[in-house]
Amino acid sequence: MTVTLIIAALYLALAGAYLLVVPAALYLYLQKRWYVASSWERAFMYFLVFFFFPGLLLLAPLLNFRPRSRQIPA
């Protein structure tokens, strides 16, 4: 393997992690913690959404997380 091929594979792995892997994990994290997060955690969530926005845009047409349905006591 040449050094150029190793560098290209490293760039491809980092791009895949930035655009697919981390945003998918972020979607799951946001789905679990959105309604119970503290203010500091909510600010951290906003930062993560800002930082990984391109990957979230790529995954948005494929994922559709609707809000939880409310339980209204009768």
UniProtKB/Swiss-Prot annotation:
What broad class describes the main subcellular location of this protein? membrane
Annotated localization: Cellular thylakoid membrane
- Give the Enzyme Commission number: 7.1.1.-
**Keyword set for this entry?**
Membrane, NAD, NADP, Plastoquinone, Quinone, Thylakoid, Translocase, Transmembrane, Transmembrane helix, Transport
Q: Which family does it belong to?
A: Belongs to the complex I NdhL subunit family.
Q: What does this protein do?
A: NDH-1 shuttles electrons from an unknown electron donor, via FMN and iron-sulfur (Fe-S) centers, to quinones in the respiratory and/or the photosynthetic chain. The immediate electron acceptor for the enzyme in this species is believed to be plastoquinone. Couples the redox reaction to proton translocation, and thus conserves the redox energy in a proton gradient. Cyanobacterial NDH-1 also plays a role in inorganic carbon-concentration.
Which named protein is this?
NAD(P)H-quinone oxidoreductase subunit L
What organism, scientifically named, is this protein from? Synechococcus elongatus (strain ATCC 33912 / PCC 7942 / FACHB-805) (Anacystis nidulans R2)
Q: What is the lineage of its organism?
A: Bacteria, Bacillati, Cyanobacteriota, Cyanophyceae, Synechococcales
